[in-house]
């Protein structure tokens, strides 16, 4: 969890809140395009995140967060495929200042241009786990499987080994039967989440939590 001030916590509880977004786009080639609140088309920005697909609690869910935004920008859309988008939320406090909170990192999946605007759709690092899994002879506890998945998909892990082993069934030995319907590393996370009695989402530093 990202640390915030007492003033921030108080402002969050108010009936009306004043906040704004800033961020930057970094292409795979390392070119950085910062943008500020005034660059964002009013009403265009959104972040959708969830931990279950219905009104009921579901164990083992592995949902990716989606972000969409439209910018007043002349940036060429073609170099933006797979580009990294870092968003920050700025909440206005009682004294009139703004406190910044960084969001998870998103990767651009769609970039479209109009005459004056750039439309982006992006997802967080959870989609990196949509990679074919071939470790069907793997045996270990939940931590071993999570560590394997994160290293294979180049994603950090928010919890320590001690954190995972302290969870329900965290020290149980797990294995994958040869006959299974696992296709991707995301499927592995799904089953590990069920064993632990939880779900997975991206934490503030784009690490599964």
Regions found by a protein language model. Give the residues of each.
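Residue-level signal for glycine
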Residues: 29, 98-100
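Short coil-to-beta transition motif at edge beta-strands of beta-rich domains
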Residues: 77-95
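Hydrophobic beta-strand residues in large extracellular and virion-surface proteins
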Residues: 21-25, 67-71, 85-89, 106-108, ...
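Short beta-strand-centered aromatic/proline hotspots
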Residues: 101-113
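Residues that flank catalytic or metal-binding motifs in active/ligand-binding sites
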Residues: 65, 104, 196
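Charged- and aromatic-enriched interaction segments used to assemble
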Residues: 97, 112-209
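Juxtamembrane "anchor/assembly" segments of surface/extracellular structural proteins
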Residues: 1-80, 116, 123-129, 135-138, ...
